[in-house]
Amino acid sequence: FVHYEGPDRRGIDCALLYDPQQFTVTNSKLVLSTPFEGDTVHLTRGFLIVDGRMAGERVCFIVNHWPSRGAKSPVRVHAAKQVKALTDSLLREDKKLKLFVMGDMNDDPMDESMQTLGARKYVSGMKASQFYNPWWEILEDKGVGTLLYRGKWNLFDRIVLSRPVVKAKKGLRYDHSEVFIRDYLIQQDGKYKGAPLRTHGGRVWLNGYSDHLPTIVYLKK
């Protein structure tokens, strides 16, 4: 795995867990998030950039965990602007870069922060600096999300893909994506039936996995 200690006061950091038989790391760094409106007290997670080789090609990941919904939308837009600057720089350097921006963005796929990043609902009309955001359709059109809050599904956890990933005719390219929903990940009874099965609720151990469901992007070559 790739991990750097970040400035979050609770010790929550971003990391990339990978299979060394599938992916070889060539370079990595943590880019610290700049304070929002000069607030140096509530520092948030940085942006973990991991460059490497997979299936004989260069790929790059930016791992994120944007500020929670306890903060208002402009704080996450601020994070998105910083990631956008990073992706613009990477794609200027290598226009064919297969780049994945991933993590818990604490916003839904159609929210302002994702528009700031340039994450689009559809592949058609994508510009070189934009990303395909398959989760927009999954949430908005299919009603599937990764976390349930007050009876409503949100989809905060996602992987968006640069144009070379979705437009490639050969080599490593996008196939499909899904929210990984299985019975063992879901609360089967009680007040929260149908919600992701948490590890704990308050001080009660629930023996679950997470209050968020995983998302998967499938690639082919």
Where is each model-derived feature located?
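A long, amphipathic alpha-helix that forms part
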Residues: 73-95
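Active-site-proximal beta-strand/loop segments in catalytic clefts of secreted hydrolases
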Residues: 2-7, 17-20, 30, 62-67, ...
